[in-house]
């Protein structure tokens, strides 16, 4: 697979879980003999929701909720077949979203 690059994007609501998953991916791929660039932290997406506390009136009383999406980027340069095979069999937590592009 000379001249190719695999780009992995990780998304999660918990920054500790995403860092552990990125570390696990980097360790597995480097043990398989490929070179890794990253993990690169991408900007955190922050969604804020404003909700009126009362069901009928008191519009001045509001509550704010926020949801943060943490993102990481990992590039695998010139992946070996062993590295690709180890990526296919890696076990990651369920709350981490993974996008892989070739």
From Swiss-Prot:
Belongs to the universal ribosomal protein uS10 family. GO terms for molecular function: structural constituent of ribosome; tRNA binding. Keywords: Ribonucleoprotein, Ribosomal protein. Coiled coil: none annotated. HAMAP family: Ribosomal_uS10. Gene3D superfamilies: Ribosomal protein S10 domain. Part of the 30S ribosomal subunit. The lineage of its organism: Bacteria, Bacillati, Actinomycetota, Actinomycetes, Bifidobacteriales. Involved in the binding of tRNA to the ribosomes. One of its GO terms (biological process) is translation. SUPFAM superfamilies: Ribosomal protein S10 (SSF54999). It comes from the Bacteria. It comes from Bifidobacterium longum subsp. infantis (strain ATCC 15697 / DSM 20088 / JCM 1222 / NCTC 11817 / S12). The keyword Ribosomal protein applies. Pfam families: Ribosomal_S10. The keyword Ribosomal protein applies. This is Small ribosomal subunit protein uS10. One of its GO terms (cellular component) is ribonucleoprotein complex. InterPro entries: Ribosomal_uS10, Ribosomal_uS10_CS, Ribosomal_uS10_dom, Ribosomal_uS10_dom_sf.
